[in-house]
């Protein structure tokens, strides 16, 4: 049976290669062709002997993801790709171009089951989990377009990473592998809706990644409206899990807070949020919502955003307001895929 050779560690590749009678060092050569040179044709892997290349054609699967669409913002700061996988599934990935290097935002599932009211990816529910190789392929798709260093990885595209736990962990270990991209795990951020037992499990993995939790509200009433899946875990329990993660890993947790006019962006909401987290060492990433024609939700005024931020900082909380990158190219989760499908 043919084996898909994309998305495997060097030890896994060595085991497969040697089990079929080839020298162990050929695995490293093959891995270099795949991940350092991004070559998908066995015929072009000329360091491998001819008989091995012919054997690979018969016994290995190597399918290159297809970029179906890509668009870059007017200011050049954001590029979004729509990538077609081998089974025809479409996933989005975004590259944010910073002065210190590129930050790649990847999807971990096709579709999403979380039901966030502001997200287009969840409209049709969850289709399937992505494999570690399929997540990795999104990162490498940008290698075709940009010859620039990748500084950081953000698991913040379509899907809930912690419900695809094993493949997401495999991806993190692959992308941080010195033989692949060698991204420091400290430059990897995993964003979750707050699945409490999985946060505790992640804390035990010994991977000091940054944890970002989609909080989006100061209480359960508002949070359940914005994020229906949050009904499974009380907001106080989510915050407590974040605190345990910090104590176990030493990594400060980021709370993502999307600001929606007349929903969760008032002075009272800010004060309640401060009471919720108490003296916890954390960071707030404030995100004025991306308004679209498909949802009747709008960002607060810039003045109200600053007031919200100032209240948090008055209580000693570290905050940032996310740069509005990619608005005009529909860079919010799921929007490029939706537009592509509407045109078909």
Q: Which residues does each PLM region occupy?
A:
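A short loop-to-beta-strand scaffold at the N-terminal edge of the catalytic core in hydrolase folds
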Residues: 90-95
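Short linear Ser/Thr-Pro motifs
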Residues: 73, 107-108, 121, 191, ...
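Glutamine-centric residue-chemistry signal
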Residues: 29, 109, 135-138, 309
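Auxiliary Fe-S-binding modules of radical SAM enzymes
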Residues: 1-89, 243-251, 259-344
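Conserved AdoMet/S-adenosylmethionine-binding subsite of the radical SAM
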Residues: 143-152, 157-317, 322
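Canonical Radical SAM [4Fe-4S] cluster-binding loop centered on the CxxxCxxC motif
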Residues: 97-134
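Conserved alpha-helical substructure of the radical SAM core
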Residues: 122-152
């Amino acid at each position: 049976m043919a084996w898909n050779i994309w998305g495997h560690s060097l030890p896994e590749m060595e085991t497969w290669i040697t089990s079929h009678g080839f020298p162990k060092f050929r695995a490293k050569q093959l891995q270099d062709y795949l991940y350092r040179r991004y070559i998908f044709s066995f015929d072009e892997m000329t360091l491998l002997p001819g008989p091995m290349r012919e054997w690979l054609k018969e016994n290995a699967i190597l399918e290159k993801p297809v970029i179906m669409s890509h668009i870059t913002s007017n200011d050049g700061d954001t590029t979004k790709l729509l990538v077609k996988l081998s089974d025809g599934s479409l996933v989005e990935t975004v590259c944010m171009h910073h002065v210190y290097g590129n930050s790649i935002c990847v999807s971990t599932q096709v579709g999403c089951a979380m039901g966030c009211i502001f997200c287009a990816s969840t409209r049709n529910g969850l289709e399937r989990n992505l494999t570690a190789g399929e997540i990795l392929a999104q990162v490498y798709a940008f290698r075709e377009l940009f010859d620039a260093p990748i500084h950081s990885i953000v698991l913040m595209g379509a899907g809930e990473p912690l419900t695809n736990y094993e493949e997401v962990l495999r991806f993190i270990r692959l992308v941080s592998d010195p033989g692949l991209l060698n991204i420091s795990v400290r430059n990897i951020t995993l964003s979750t809706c707050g699945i409490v037992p999985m946060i505790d499990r992640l804390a035990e993995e010994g991977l000091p990644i940054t944890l970002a939790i989609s909080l989006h509200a100061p209480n359960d009433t508002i949070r359940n409206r914005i994020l229906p899946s949050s009904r499974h875990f009380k907001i106080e329990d989510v915050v407590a899990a974040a605190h345990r993660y910090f104590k176990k890993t030493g990594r400060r947790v980021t709370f993502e807070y999307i600001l929606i006019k007349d929903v969760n962006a008032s002075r009272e909401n800010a004060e309640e949020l401060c009471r919720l987290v108490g003296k916890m060492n954390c960071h707030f990433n404030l995100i004025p919502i991306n308004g679209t024609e498909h949802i009747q939700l709008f960002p607060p005024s810039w003045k109200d955003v600053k007031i919200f931020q100032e209240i948090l900082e008055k209580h000693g909380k570290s905050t940032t307001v996310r740069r509005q990158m990619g608005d005009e190219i529909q860079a919010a989760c799921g929007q490029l895929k939706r537009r592509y499908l509407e045109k078909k």
